[in-house]
């Protein structure tokens, strides 16, 4: 057990018996009241966001974690099969662990899997940006290229991304895996 003041963003704690990752932690001292920490956390088992107010003197149980790089191989039902880059061991990761960023998983991409002290998978950290090929989008006309705005495009992983009008089928684009937004066109 450690004081809440020693915990920071990204720490994984055991809260009400389940693992939660701290997404933001703000120290507040309102007027003549006692200081507290306002925490926004994500339940790693259910994926739900939780907001809680800890008193400044409160202690929390920090989970000791290990982070290891794994390579994505393929999807097997509702699980994703990943391979340890060093030992070539394969593990199955449930789809709920990845959340919405799983729609940008493509063969060979490297992710970081966070394991708890008991060996269970707590979280999967995707790369912030991923480069994908546009496989389907509406054709552009000369007039479309002159205007700003977006159009829907299907990328190689099957996800739909809003892209600028000048993007065509076969273009390589960079996408933010956290939000699913188009970042830029990649020139190769």
Curated annotation (Swiss-Prot):
Which compartments does it reside in?
Answer: Cytoplasm
Q: Which domain of life is it from?
A: Bacteria
Which coarse location class describes where this protein primarily resides? cytoplasm
Q: Which GO terms describe its biological process?
A: peptide biosynthetic process
Q: Which Pfam families match?
A: EFP, EFP_N, Elong-fact-P_C
The record's Gene3D superfamilies line, in alphabetical order, gives:
2.30.30.30, Nucleic acid-binding proteins
Per UniProt, what is one GO molecular function of this protein? Answer: translation elongation factor activity
Pathway field = Protein biosynthesis; polypeptide chain elongation
Q: Which GO terms describe its cellular component?
A: cytoplasm
What keywords were assigned to this record? Cytoplasm, Elongation factor, Protein biosynthesis
| Function of the molecule | Involved in peptide bond synthesis. Stimulates efficient translation and peptide-bond synthesis on native or reconstituted 70S ribosomes in vitro. Probably functions indirectly by altering the affinity of the ribosome for aminoacyl-tRNA, thus increasing their reactivity as acceptors for peptidyl transferase.
Spell out the family assignment given in the record's similarity comment: Belongs to the elongation factor P family.
NCBIfam families (alphabetical): efp (TIGR00038), PRK00529.1 (NF001810)
Tell me the HAMAP family matching this sequence.
EF_P
Its recorded name reads Elongation factor P
Per the UniProt record, the lineage of the source organism begins with:
Bacteria, Pseudomonadati, Chlorobiota, Chlorobiia, Chlorobiales
